[in-house]
Curated annotation (Swiss-Prot):
InterPro entries: rRNA_ssu_MeTfrase_G, SAM-dependent_MTases_sf. S-adenosyl-L-methionine binds at G74, F79, I127, E128, R143. This is Ribosomal RNA small subunit methyltransferase G. Keywords: Cytoplasm, Methyltransferase, rRNA processing, S-adenosyl-L-methionine, Transferase. The keyword Lipid metabolism does not apply. The gene is rsmG. Specifically methylates the N7 position of guanine in position 527 of 16S rRNA. Its EC number is 2.1.1.170. It comes from Chelativorans sp. (strain BNC1). It is an enzyme of class 2 (transferase). Its main location: cytoplasm. One of its GO terms (cellular component) is cytosol. GO terms for molecular function: rRNA (guanine-N7-)-methyltransferase activity.
């Protein structure tokens, strides 16, 4: 079972040490424990937590293998930000900033990631309150947070400084792209989801208001 999980992780994220794999397994265990007390994710997805959330998050590393400064907006239960932070342990020096305004979820992230000594900082604030506090990252991530036009408005201050965004989107992503084009210009690359399903990962760069 563990060997299969390790192989699946390497298939989507590239070479990963056994220590990093063990860290992700430990995070999964903490996630399940805390989920019994607070709502970290939809209960229906818990039986498939490794594939549905952890591997789905880990695949971003393959798209931006050289990035060392990441910013995760609306981190929720830690996907993809916590997974990226754990993966970054073997790529020091690295920094992952996770922004989550829900205090209980932020407490979970702080406790679980501190115990794993992940190179990250948790910001228990609204995204808009973090402008000027978090230095420009190389990559911005967001998963199940908001439609593209809203995401662009939230990410704009960092993207103007040169960051690119890797955004998980579902089957309606083309409609969101078209709705964004009235107000925003941007470069777009579409990456297939290596874990399966109808979703994609949108790589956005050179974001600008029209």
């Amino acid at each position: 079972m563990m060997a299969e999980r390790f192989s699946a992780l390497q298939a989507v994220a590239g070479p990963v040490s056994r220590e990093t794999f063990d860290g992700l397994v430990a995070f999964e265990g903490e996630f399940r424990k805390w989920s019994a007390r607070i709502n970290l994710t939809a209960p229906s997805t818990l039986p498939h937590l490794w594939e549905r959330h952890i591997l789905d998050s880990a695949q971003l590393i393959r798209i931006a293998p050289a990035a060392r400064r990441w910013l995760d907006l609306g981190s929720g239960g830690g996907f993809p930000g916590a997974v990226i932070a754990i993966l970054m342990k073997e790529h020091a020096p690295a920094q992952v900033d996770l922004v989550e305004s829900n205090r209980k979820k932020a407490a979970f992230l702080q406790t679980s990631l501190a115990s794993l000594k992940a190179p990250c900082m948790i910001h228990p604030q609204r995204i808009e309150d973090c402008y000027g506090q978090i230095p420009p990252p190389e990559v911005i991530t967001a998963r199940a947070l908001a439609p593209l036009p809203v995401l662009f408005g939230l990410a704009e201050p960092w993207m103007k400084a040169g960051a690119r965004a890797l955004l998980h989107k579902g089957r309606d992503y083309r409609r969101e792209i078209e709705e964004s084009r009235d107000a925003w210009g941007f470069n777009l690359l579409e990456h297939g989801n290596e874990v399966g399903g109808d979703g994609v990962i949108l790589e956005i760069s050179d974001l600008r208001r029209l």
